[in-house]
Amino acid sequence: MTRMLLMGPPGSGKGTQATRIADKLGIVPISTGDIFRHNVKSMTPLGVEAKRYIDNGDFVPDEVTNRMVADRIAQADAEHGFLLDGYPRTKGQVEALDAMLAEAGQSLSAVVELEVPDEELVERLLKRAEIEGRADDTQEVIEHRLDLYHRETESVIQEYVERGIVARVDGTGQIDDVTERLLQAVYSVRSATGSLPVIQPGAES
């Protein structure tokens, strides 16, 4: 049973790769962005609570985010494994995820981080902003987002490095090439830990 995290900065192509890798591994991709949108749109109690913070321009507390994630990974389609995209982002969220999994007698199989140079990320995000008409996404704003990502996730990545379940993957180049590298990384971690099903590089689902 595969339970993994896919991490990467804004503009790294993480969302696209999460769907592709989850499909290859036969597990469900779970994006925290999608979880938030679903809860807010459906006006669930957690969604109403989160929207109150968002409307006030405040960060949604870890407690609310953790409960949303716990509810999502407890659903039937995640029973046979999942790929989490966008969570955890803080040490507190790492501890919360550990507790969720421990309660179910589970643990994380792998953490894969997509690495792309900041210069390329800025270029990608500026191009996306131009195409989508996001006038507020200036270079200064984008660089701030990237700096925030690096500061937020450094301790999270280090925590998982110490557990021996992290693989870092070059996120530059063609989408198919990045997917292949990710599959190779997952296979490598599986070989080292014995915690993932055998997914040979280049294998089709």
Curated annotation (Swiss-Prot):
ATP binds at G11, S12, G13, K14, G15, T16, R128, G173. Pfam families: ADK. AMP binds at T32, R37, D58, F59, V60, G86, Y87, P88, R89, Q93, R134, R145. Keywords: ATP-binding, Cytoplasm, Kinase, Nucleotide biosynthesis, Nucleotide-binding, Transferase. SUPFAM superfamilies: P-loop containing nucleoside triphosphate hydrolases. It catalyses: AMP + ATP = 2 ADP. GO terms for cellular component: cytoplasm. Its EC number is 2.7.4.3. Residues 31-60 are annotated as: NMP. It is found in: Cytoplasm. GO terms for biological process: AMP salvage. Pathway: Purine metabolism; AMP biosynthesis via salvage pathway; AMP from ADP: step 1/1. GO terms for molecular function: adenylate kinase activity; ATP binding. Residues 127-137 are annotated as: LID. Transmembrane segments: none annotated. PANTHER family: NUCLEOTIDE KINASE. NCBIfam families: adk, PRK00279.1-3, PRK14527.1, PRK14528.1, PRK14531.1, PRK14532.1. Monomer. Catalyzes the reversible transfer of the terminal phosphate group between ATP and AMP. Plays an important role in cellular energy homeostasis and in adenine nucleotide metabolism. Consists of three domains, a large central CORE domain and two small peripheral domains, NMPbind and LID, which undergo movements during catalysis. The LID domain closes over the site of phosphoryl transfer upon ATP binding. Assembling and dissambling the active center during each catalytic cycle provides an effective means to prevent ATP hydrolysis. Belongs to the adenylate kinase family. This is Adenylate kinase. It comes from Micrococcus luteus (strain ATCC 4698 / DSM 20030 / JCM 1464 / CCM 169 / CCUG 5858 / IAM 1056 / NBRC 3333 / NCIMB 9278 / NCTC 2665 / VKM Ac-2230) (Micrococcus lysodeikticus). The lineage of its organism: Bacteria, Bacillati, Actinomycetota, Actinomycetes, Micrococcales.
